[in-house]
């Protein structure tokens, strides 16, 4: 956004940001999603992006529950959604079992419906279709040692 001088409105809801965001024009709201009046959320339109990096734990009343059952159904067609730490069709990494993540079970159900069109999965393409990285122009991107690509991009229909 800064590099290309793109006019935008970035709202980040993160109760505990882990990294400094100095110099970025971001409206930080440090309130857990469970304490937010959903009527006050920004209205997203076609072409907007909803970037989700949640607790990854889908239990009643969790942020994942609120996102999937209340926020996503409100989105109009053409909104892009990014989920982080999604390894479909595989389970979470073995060394992550202690985290007890289950979000991707819910994401699997979303993908089975008709509201969300999968656009890109960095994990899937790197592990199941790496030949397409060159076709898409992503073969130049280096992955840091020990990191796992895990971005899933969807578009609402």
PLM-predicted stretches and their roles:
Residues 3-54, 59:
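S-adenosyl-L-methionine
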